[in-house]
Amino acid sequence: MSRALLRGAACQGCRHEVLRSFVSVSGIPMPRSSPLSSRSISNSRAFSAVTVLRSDRPPSSNQIDRHLSESQEPPAHSEANTPASSQHVPWYLQEEAPIVKDRPLTEAHLPQIPDDSPEMLSTLLEYTYKDLGLDHLKLFDLRGLEIPAALGANVIMIIGTARSVKHLNVSADRLCRWLRSQYKLSPYADGLLGRNELKIKLRRKAKRARAASAAGAMVDEKDDGITTGWICVNAGMVDKGATTTQLSDVGIEGFGNLDLGTSVVVQIFTEEKRADVDLDGLWEATLAREGRKDIRESTEDLSKTGAGPPRSTSDGFGSIPGQKRGFHTMRRLALSAMNSAEPGLEAGFPGVGASSSALPGDAAEVASQLTPTSLLQILAELPADSARNELGSGPNDRQSTLFLRLFYTNHAARFSAQEKAIFRLKLFSIAVSRQHPAYTKDTLFSTFSDFLRDGYDLPDDLGFDVVSALLTPRTAGVVTEQSETHSSEADMELALLVLDRLSLRGVPILNMRIFNILYQAVCAPKTAPSKPTESRPEEGSPSWSVVQQTESQKQTLSRLSKILAAANIPFDAVDARQLMVTLFQCGDYDGFWRLWRQFPLKGVNRTQEDYVQLFKLHAELGEEVRARECLSTGVPLMNQESPAIVLQGPIVTAIMHCILVADPTLQDRDEESPSFYMPLWTECQEALAREN
């Protein structure tokens, strides 16, 4: 029996314990074995892997005697005094100490929690770092900003990086389960595939790979539909005590309630996808722009508070943004008070003088028939210097010039508050676009914000006029201290804010007019008004505006050209003609010809004015290669138009100028070596002779 027991005990420790059990029954004290030496520890194994032949060999008596002799006998009273609780516990009954797997947590690993945050935000940050193992955590407080509607309102965004695609999916799944179990929330993970769905997609992917390998084809693995490296976990509203208000209480028409709590969104990326998307840079720039806007508005409020006594709003067109308004009892200025301006009517405002010849009566009758719309149209058609003179000293000036007196007093009572706000916004747009030093772009943007805040319906053309005015550069002739501190980056930020608000109101901002404005804003520093005759046809040299492009401007123009070619922009014939000229002046000749070819594809006929513009632009450019391309392409197309373009009028001179650029030696050649363009030149001369 003892042999069978010893055969079952494979390891040395088990054999020793079996031997002790028999010896203790016989009454012979047997000391416990001493701790194993370093040699026995090095040869020990956690799990027995002894072969069957070795386990069948019984232990020799010499081994047992050696263990008994090597053990030192302790005193007899120590064996008796040892309590039962201190007896030896076998290794298979010993409790292992728990292994701490928590990541070291310091303040540098977790972002700073903003004020008035939900209580669970700190716990969520610790869980995402310690339990999920996300790195490079960042927190963005987007409450109060205009963000995409899919994320909700009052959003706090957390961005983290996963170590791999598998870690990405596991972390998102665990986070959703944790939010459901701990806080009873209903999170939604956009981009996370379920376990069964993932198996199905992997099975289909393997099937496609086998079919492709059998056919000898390659499988495009760029976008397999399994993972994008980016999962957005939207936890929804996390404030348990969030207040609820009626929509009508916050000025929104409709029915239902509005939750004013805080939403939490966790964006989980792989390292490559996070660097590619650069969501951190997007929101950092947005928060920085919003901070500069708050500082600018607070500075304006302080400056306007102590600017002087508030004026009356008796003219009905409101006041500058930030000015206090109150009730008044002042009488509206009558037209009879303007009779003293009759002698200077034509001299001070030439547009009115031109209209007075067709209108009966004196200057008062002329002024009475001028509406604010017609006055603004006349102001927009004036030269820049004359327009700046008519606008007076600034937004506070309403009496210094005849235009201001007519604009602020004529028919003010006949228009609604919305029409008056539209007239005022148009006036500020024209003033900024005409580069008046007193009308700043910040004031224009504040007027635009007040217009939207009042709930007025903004016409699309007026919104685009505001964007164009904000992108107008400051020329050297009218630079002031205010304009010097106003950088082009700040102008672009204001213009993008206007476009964002227009987009939120449902205005289609991807159109040819916007691209025309953007191209003009990029190319504007290269066209100065001090050089009115910079590129004439007889110069025969490229336009200096194209040559002086910097590297940053070339990169911006290249990006605009790619967007214009890829985007599906609605075609508008009027805006397309203006955009073609702008593209050519900015050096985007491929974009010019691409837009030129779209006219017949969109069912629009090209007119004689279009061909005159075509030949004139290439003649002013002064490049022989492009002039030859223009002649070889444009002249045959004239006969294919419906109706055909006849060779008469201004198009004849435009073609002749283009021929001189394509072949400057045409008139110096003899009859033996005539020019290729000589037949066309002769035809143009005959057309000129017929007209004379």
Swiss-Prot record:
Organism field: Penicillium rubens (strain ATCC 28089 / DSM 1075 / NRRL 1951 / Wisconsin 54-1255) (Penicillium chrysogenum)
Entry keyword set: Membrane, Mitochondrion, Mitochondrion inner membrane, Transit peptide
Keyword Lipid metabolism: no
Gene3D superfamilies: Beta Polymerase, domain 2
Subcellular location: Mitochondrion inner membrane
UniProt function note: Probable mitochondrial mRNA stabilization factor.
Gene Ontology CC annotations of this record: mitochondrial inner membrane
Membrane topology of the entry: Peripheral membrane protein
Family (UniProt): Belongs to the ATP25 family.
Pfam family, one: RsfS
InterPro entries in the cross-refs: Atp25, NT_sf
Composition bias type Basic and acidic residues, residue spans: 293-303
Coiled coil: none
Transit peptide: 1-48
GO biological process, one term: mitochondrial gene expression
Region described as Disordered: spans on this chain: 52-86, 293-322, 528-548
Record's protein name: ATPase synthesis protein 25, mitochondrial
